[in-house]
Amino acid sequence: MPPYQIRWLERPEEFERAAEVLAEVWGMRDLRDTIPGHFMRAIADNGGVVLGAFDERGRMVGVLVGILAMDRETGKIYHYSHMLGILRDLRYSGLGYEMKLFQREELLKQGIDLVMWTFDPLRGPNAKLNFSKLGAVCRRYYENYYGELRDELNVGEVTDRFKVEWWIKSNRVSKRLAGEFPTPPLE
């Protein structure tokens, strides 16, 4: 994988570009369907994480957006990782994994030990990243979680989702990330 710079977004134009990248990744024809740049700025400045990945020419090729969250039942504070998008020409390159590792390091600095997010259980590459590479676990399944979405990746599909937990301080996750917790064969 070529070298990419992963860093926090800082300038208004970077947040606006991040909104465009997310729209491109999901095939959102209407920018109202993505997270607005000004809202990403508010997220980044108030406990959330907004990261960009840049290629050697300075082109933004990936975006990760997450917010500080709290479980309503238990009061547990965690990080909710809402969107991770990589431009199509770099999908499956390992960049998404690198962005999640960067996110983990930043959250550990904040004292966060739990990250949660949803994903479509029928998308195999996402399942491999989340379970096999990152070591996330799933305890919840939601039928039609988002309702009808208009982006190209989800239009006309039911939005069933797994909600995964990534315990970023756990020994199991540390071993998975270090390659000491082998993925069982599918045979």
Language model features by range: what are they?
Residues 1, 11-24, 173-187:
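A short, well-structured alpha-helix characteristic of acyl/acetyltransferase catalytic modules
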Residues 4-88, 106, 120, 142:
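A conserved beta-strand-loop-helix scaffold within acyl/acetyltransferase catalytic domains
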Residues 92-107, 126:
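Conserved acetyl-CoA-binding loop-helix of GNAT-fold acetyltransferases
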Residues 107-120, 130:
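Conserved GNAT acetyl-CoA-binding A-motif
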Residues 118, 128, 132-154:
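Conserved catalytic-core motifs of GNAT/GCN5-like acyltransferases
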Residues 144-177:
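C-terminal "cap" of GNAT-fold acetyltransferases
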